[in-house]
């Protein structure tokens, strides 16, 4: 069943609380109350080419940003703006590849280095700059940062993962590192429906044939293959719900709900327009984001 809940072009979306769905429109982030017929409860300031948002459940701070790295910070649920326009010095950030603690945010910048934003004064600082390697992703697990790096040049290399502890002053303390030679590149990161498991879109050549969604298990220093990335399940479109063994396999034309172990198609949806992404909202509901609007689906 398809139900249109927004009529405007929408690129991304995610739940920030159990009842709140936030959506990326062309120039703003809009917040909707799912318990009240998707009533609008928040609308951000405008930024051209809005990209996405990052929400910290503990502090309830919402960082919205555009493709060129301009951003605003808000305090939820009031929606009060906490800053003037910020400049992150980074482009096309993935929200699940942003880390936050206290007054600081960490992310990879336009030079593929690690950058830290200080929200007290809006300043940024470049750290972990390396001539041979570049930072491609940052994964936060509690007070640890796992920093994914790969070779700057297109030569045979491997992903090196550096682990740092965030101390009480917001400084990074080196702990350990390891290399993953089968993985040539890890570009896409998205949290599972449980918001704890990290799913990485990995181009793989040695351990597994082809490209896969893999679950990152930092405590075991390993990656577990979940589902192949194919023309049907594009890297930037899908979403997993591992607890229920389901995945949204999405591409620009349709979305399928698939049982992961059996690869059985449980449902297929073909909304009007071009599909940009899809996300699980509950165990039996989801949302599809298209150039014609946002659709709620029930399966």
Describe the residue ranges of each PLM region.
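An edge-strand/N-cap motif at the start of beta-rich repeat modules
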Residues: 1-38
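A short beta-strand motif characteristic of beta-propeller blades
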Residues: 2-9, 38-44, 80-90, 123-129, ...
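Repeated scaffold domains used in trafficking and secretory/extracellular systems
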Residues: 8-18, 47-57, 90-101, 132-142, ...
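Short beta-strand elements that form the blades of beta-propeller/WD-repeat-like
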Residues: 19-24, 60-65, 103-108, 144-150, ...
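Structural motif
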Residues: 28-30, 69-74, 112-115, 154-163, ...
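Short loop/turn segments that connect beta-strands within beta-propeller blades
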Residues: 34-37, 76-79, 118-122, 166-170, ...
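Solenoidal tandem-repeat scaffolds enriched in leucines and small polar residues
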Residues: 106, 113-120, 125-182, 191-193, ...
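Blade-level signature of beta-propeller repeat domains, shared across WD40, Kelch, NHL, RCC1
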Residues: 273-299
């Amino acid at each position: 069943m398809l139900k249109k809940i927004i009529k405007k072009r929408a690129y991304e979306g995610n739940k920030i609380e159990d009842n709140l769905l936030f959506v990326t429109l062309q120039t703003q982030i809009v917040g909707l109350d799912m318990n009240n017929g998707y009533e609008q409860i928040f609308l951000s300031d405008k930024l051209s080419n809005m990209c996405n948002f990052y929400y910290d459940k503990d502090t309830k701070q919402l960082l919205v940003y555009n493709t060129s790295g301009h951003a605003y910070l808000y305090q939820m649920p009031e929606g009060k703006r906490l800053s003037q326009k910020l400049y992150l010095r980074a482009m096309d950030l993935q929200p699940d590849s942003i880390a936050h603690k206290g007054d600081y945010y960490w992310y990879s910048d336009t030079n593929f280095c690690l950058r830290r934003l200080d929200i007290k004064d809006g300043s940024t600082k470049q750290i972990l700059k390396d001539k041979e390697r570049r930072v491609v992703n940052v994964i936060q697990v509690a007070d640890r940062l796992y920093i994914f790096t790969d070779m700057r040049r297109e030569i045979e290399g491997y992903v090196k993962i550096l682990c740092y502890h965030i101390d009480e002053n917001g400084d990074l303390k080196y702990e350990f590192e390891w290399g993953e030679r089968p993985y040539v590149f890890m570009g896409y990161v998205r949290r599972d429906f449980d918001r704890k498991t990290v799913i990485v879109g990995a181009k793989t050549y040695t351990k597994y044939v082809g490209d896969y969604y893999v679950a990152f298990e930092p405590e075991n220093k390993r990656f577990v293959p979940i589902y192949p990335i194919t023309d049907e399940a594009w890297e930037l479109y899908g979403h997993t719900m591992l607890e229920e063994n389901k995945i949204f396999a999405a591409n620009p034309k349709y979305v399928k709900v698939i049982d992961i172990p059996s690869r059985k198609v449980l449902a297929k949806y073909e909304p009007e327009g071009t599909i940009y992404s899809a996300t699980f909202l509950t165990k039996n509901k989801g949302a599809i984001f298209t150039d014609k609007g946002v659709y709620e689906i029930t399966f």
